[in-house]
Amino acid sequence: MALRNLRYDGDEILRKKSKEITVIDDRILTLLDDMIDTMYENDGIGLAAPQVGILKRAVVIDVEDGNIYKMINPRILSTSDEEQTAQEGCLSVRETKGMVSRPIKVTAEYTDVEGNLITIEAEGLLARAICHEIDHLNGVLFTDKIIKSTK
């Protein structure tokens, strides 16, 4: 496993839509492991492949102290009508934090590293992280959704 270089706001790759992963091979597994190392090294709770310069639909998330989600081709199936506004930051936008409104609950679907299709019901911080990271896969940064800047 190795650290990958982060891409920062202003890098055009962060504004491009990522491609579906069709084969889960050693390159994808290594990418996910490297993303986890890079996320931890930078004190993050989530990281999407475009943030390390790879336009593939891959995300890693750890909001629960070591309960790591490795998500391939994640997508949101449904969201709660109720939203919560909370502060967000981003490893690719280091100097900015802001209040962003997100659904309190989401139902998401993704493929795990063994090729199994997983459906997850998430709420709170995990739901927020899933939405934030999937936004990255679609070329959207949290700064596009800020209601009020806090830093």
Regions found by a protein language model. Name each.
Residues 1-151:
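Positively charged
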